């Protein structure tokens, strides 16, 4: 999933000079909720960049089948609504099916996704990641 999203991002950057941010959800949370970015103005600039970039790709949303904390769910919902109002595109990458994603991110965020007229693409098949030694797990 991430490789495909990366290819889309590369195409937009190379051929259409569009701005793209590709971030894991955990990294966004760390930067905004756990003071990885200590300066408030820098955090505000980062948040604005997430809102205004031409294409935002968020990888591993609600990873490990985890349910988002209320503050994270609220932030995601507001971020998606802001991007929708600005007519900015977003790609969410997750291992959740739509029903379990709804439970993991909550009503507010799920309704924000629906406002985009989303396309659910299920990708199946073996992992493309290389094996580690003789371990194939």
Question: Model features per residue range: what roles?
Answer:
Residues 1-21:
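Walker A/P-loop
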Residues 1-3, 27-30:
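Short, catalytically relevant binding-site loops at active-site mouths
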Residues 18, 52-53, 88:
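Short coil/turn segments at beta-strand junctions that form active-site/ligand-binding loops
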Residues 50-51, 113:
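A short, aliphatic-rich alpha-helical micro-motif
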Residues 56-57:
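Walker B beta-strand of ABC/ABC-like P-loop ATPase nucleotide-binding domains
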Residues 39, 44-48:
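Alpha-helical adaptor scaffolds
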